[in-house]
């Protein structure tokens, strides 16, 4: 399971070191793609295959489904972890997520998310994420 929040620096070549716990879960190669909320999603090859199977079931007759599939798959790339534990984040993905110098890498159960510091701080300050509202949603979900 991928959990935790880590702050790292993107070097001038677009590389970032992944936390060792995340490297163990994701493997030497994994998929990185555009995520929701202007962050990046990273999936192990196994989790990506599971996700692909689910997404194959989306109706191609739906314009929204086609748009989502294009968004999600066109931005995807296979990343390989180097001997120093770093990955190279392609320029198009760095631009999409506004990744500059400092980034937050978080674990969200079956995926990682890579956030720019600015976007992460804004997300955490979002009033709709108050503890009370989260508790209410958890109760609604029976958690």
UniProtKB/Swiss-Prot annotation:
Record-annotated SpoVT-AbrB domain positions: 5-47, 76-119
Subcellular location: Cytoplasm, Nucleoid
One GO location term (cellular component): nucleoid
InterPro entries attached to this UniProt entry: MraZ, MraZ_C, MraZ_dom, MraZ_N, MraZ_sf, SpoVT-AbrB_dom, SpoVT-AbrB_sf
Keyword Transcription attributed: yes
Biological-process GO terms, alphabetical: negative regulation of DNA-templated transcription initiation
Name of one Pfam family that matches: MraZ
UniProt record similarity statement: Belongs to the MraZ family.
Oligomeric form and interacting partners: Forms oligomers.
Protein name: Transcriptional regulator MraZ
Species whose genome carries this gene: Caldicellulosiruptor saccharolyticus (strain ATCC 43494 / DSM 8903 / Tp8T 6331)
Record gene name: mraZ
């Amino acid at each position: 399971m991928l959990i935790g929040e880590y702050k790292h620096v993107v070097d001038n070549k677009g590389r970032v070191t992944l936390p060792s716990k995340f490297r163990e879960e994701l493997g030497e190669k994994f998929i990185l793609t555009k995520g929701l909320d202007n962050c990046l999603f990273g999936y192990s090859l196994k989790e990506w295959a599971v996700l692909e199977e689910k997404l194959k079931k989306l109706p191609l007759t739906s314009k929204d489904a086609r748009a989502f599939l294009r968004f999600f798959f066109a931005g995807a790339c296979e990343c390989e972890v180097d001997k120093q534990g770093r990955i190279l984040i392609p320029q198009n993905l760095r631009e999409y997520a506004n990744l500059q110098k400092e980034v937050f890498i978080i674990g969200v159960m079956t995926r990682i998310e890579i956030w720019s510091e600015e976007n992460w701080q804004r997300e955490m300050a979002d009033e709709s994420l108050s503890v009370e509202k989260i508790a209410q949603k958890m109760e609604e979900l029976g958690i």
